[in-house]
């Protein structure tokens, strides 16, 4: 792994059912450098989301290696550090929203990380403003549009201030 690499995949292979011959990800190798913007394009069902879930160890490769700043995603002791460094916004925001009020949802991960209250308030407000959801901060997420829910999910990850942000079609549901 090069000094400025934040993510590296080497010959990653993954299949959801090891009894089946077809791989969802088959031999992918790539590097993402710090500060770089990368888009992975492909047809529906080609493995883009599956690959993305490898970068914060939601999925682990059947073979090959995924490194986050030289930390192997298969190393249990590094899982916490990896997930702090790589934030992910899922394609469907309902899979990510856990609280009953928008600002509580944005603060959820920060509470789990033990971020001090004053800093948490600043991060939550800044993230909600950046994601364009600040005006909805006291609303229930289930009463928001799909695009607004996506903004809540984006704000929650931004508030964590990860070194790398993975967006799995995160703008697909956004309102104009």
State where each predicted segment sits.
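Catalytic Walker B motif of ABC-type/P-loop ATPase nucleotide-binding domains
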Residues: 165-168
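Helix-to-loop junction immediately C-terminal to a conserved catalytic motif
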Residues: 56
